[in-house]
Design a protein with these regions (language model features):
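Active-site microenvironment for binding and transforming phosphate-containing groups
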Residues: 1-221
């Protein structure tokens, strides 16, 4: 899971390991460049530091894979504690491989965690509300982080192969531009951990879609 939050007071990157020690030790990944902005809190969770058992061990953050619901809630509480944010301020995506982006407001706090989501089919979240924590979820897909330092707004998007070929990054920036006046020159971007090209095989049909959409970059596909 990836989480992202604007601090209350507040382009090539390699994540570093952040450990939240104590009885609830977590191993999280963070980007030093985003931390240095002193505007956002963020992390990419690993499987370590939770309470889930067996095939869900241990930091399972999914409510729909058959894990014990209370264990998942405790895992969320541990991440929230490490990020120093109430769990009720987390806002979760509803990922279905779209390029839909939701403007998150204070009324959305807790959506997908402490209350039902008032939205569906949302793979990108944006906000300029301090204190809200955006959360998206990953297996082998790509997390995209956006920080508009001028307008103090953030975006967090899930981009699988379908989202990538449909330009999820562009859709997120467009949504931020419409909502906050964001322009690319003011935005720091980061690409989170995902599967590598050596481990991800696609069908000929999928490869053809990429060739057609990114015809000017054929040698890189």
């Amino acid at each position: 899971m990836t989480e992202f939050q604007i601090k209350e007071d507040g382009r090539s990157m390699i994540p570093s390991v952040f450990s939240h020690a104590g009885k609830k030790e977590l191993v999280l990944l963070q980007y030093p460049q985003l931390q240095a902005l002193d505007m956002v809190k963020h992390c990419f969770t690993t499987r370590m530091g939770g309470v889930s058992k067996n095939e869900f061990s241990s930091l399972d953050l999914s409510f729909n894979r058959g894990d014990d619901i209370e264990a998942v809630k405790e895992n969320f509480r541990r991440v929230a504690e490490a990020m120093e944010v109430p769990a009720g301020q987390i806002v979760c995506s509803d990922q279905t491989h779209t390029t839909n982006v939701r403007k998150v407001t204070a009324e959305d706090a807790g959506s997908g965690l402490t209350k039902e989501r008032p939205y569906h089919d949302v793979d990108g979240l944006i906000t300029d509300v301090p204190g809200l924590m955006l959360a998206t979820f990953y297996a082998d897909c790509v997390p995209l982080y956006f920080v508009d330092t001028k307008h103090r707004a953030i975006g967090l998007s899930h981009s699988g192969w379908r989202g990538t070929v449909n330009r999820m990054g562009r859709a997120t920036l467009k949504a931020m531009a419409e909502a906050y006046g964001t322009v690319p020159e003011d935005v720091w971007c980061a690409i989170g951990p995902s599967i590598c090209q050596d481990c991800y095989e696609v069908s000929e049909d999928v490869a053809l879609e990429f060739e057609q959409e990114f015809s000017g970059h054929g040698s890189e596909i």
